[in-house]
From Swiss-Prot:
One of its GO terms (cellular component) is cytosol. It catalyses: tRNA(Pro) + L-proline + ATP = L-prolyl-tRNA(Pro) + AMP + diphosphate. SUPFAM superfamilies: Class II aaRS ABD-related, Class II aaRS and biotin synthetases. The gene is proS. Keywords: Aminoacyl-tRNA synthetase, ATP-binding, Cytoplasm, Ligase, Nucleotide-binding, Protein biosynthesis. This is Proline--tRNA ligase. Belongs to the class-II aminoacyl-tRNA synthetase family. ProS type 2 subfamily. It is found in: Cytoplasm. Catalyzes the attachment of proline to tRNA(Pro) in a two-step reaction: proline is first activated by ATP to form Pro-AMP and then transferred to the acceptor end of tRNA(Pro).
Amino acid sequence: MRLSKYYIPTLKETPTDVSVTSHVYSLRSGLIRQVASGIYAWLPLGLKVLKNIENVIKEEMNKSGILEVLMPLIQPASLWQESGRYNDYGSEMLRIKDRNNREMVFGPTHEEVVTDLLRTTLTSYKNLPLILYQVQWKFRDELRPRYGIMRCREFLMKDAYSFDKDFNSAIESYNLMFKVYIQIFRRLGLTPIAVKADSGPIGGNLSHEFHILANSGESTLYYDQDIINLINNDNIDIEKIKNTYTAADDLHNSETCPIPASNIKTSKGIEIGHIFYLGDKYSKTMNAAFSQNNETQLLHMGCYGIGVSRLVGAIIEVSHDNNGIIWPEEIAPFKFSLVNVFSANKECRNISENLYAKLDSNDVLYDDTEDSTGIKFSRMDLLGMPWQVIIGKTTIEHGLIEVRQRSSKKSLLMSTEQFLNNFKKS
């Protein structure tokens, strides 16, 4: 993609009402723009990142046999009244009426809808276990939206729901989703710390939050230092991970902690996912059941959420420097930024154009503008593509291009042929 043809409204200065790094860089790099308090428009560059994260999530879910659906954003209030949760979200849940004066809600979550879906469509216990997921926009009227896309009112979420015939099978589904979450976060370049958590208005008696370590996090985490190695191990052992001590500040007690204080690490964390075993909380109140051996039994359920749009902010929080964002390669909007620092030089221009023509335009952002070298480098550092390909003086004098890694700032000199052979298919 040619920068001259792309729309990236960058900002030179940081807005005065912005505090956290992810909010600063998501505005300055032209990922988003605020439309109202806690509500953002996603611009071309930001939307590419959002879609790349969504694709990673879908790939991991799909290869684990989890089926994608799409449920309605507007839901009948009657389902929430039936489940007993209509008042649980208070003013956070937006309530509306249609032209027939029927009460509807703008869904903050989808437990009621998916339970209703299964109770009306499940025909046999042989369809169990079953896990369904969707990637859907949601709305919660936060009292104090802040930190940009980290805590906003409208957000993109991946939510999944499991249905099983008994407790043991439900825990197997829970553990499967636990493992899938670790795989997703690792592909995104993150090391998730799973901590036992309160279930809140979602319900159930077992839940884990997934956090990443970040100084800007709102939660304080306490964890056995061995958990990092377990999370990063190629062979993910869910039982070992679940049995290794981790706790957020609301559940940690230093006096009753079962491991030595010398083994405990403390850090701030950002929540990026949450999983719940719900039991029969919804199936009982909404009569979602199946029949086996002429006996009617309630479904055992679980639910599992990842804040997709929140992940964009969380990744920036842990992957940046003083110059801008450092995108992990898996989700970067472009893999390469191609920079011609001598745009007035015919030879440099021809080399840049020829190289650009040989690259996939979806993989490269080509700065073909007439801006100064300093502006070009500052802009590319801000935007954070993993690799910067620089055409300049060395190219003219020695026939070599400079390939600079954004994260390490290390550079390699090579011919265009070497670059294409080494990087194009990597």
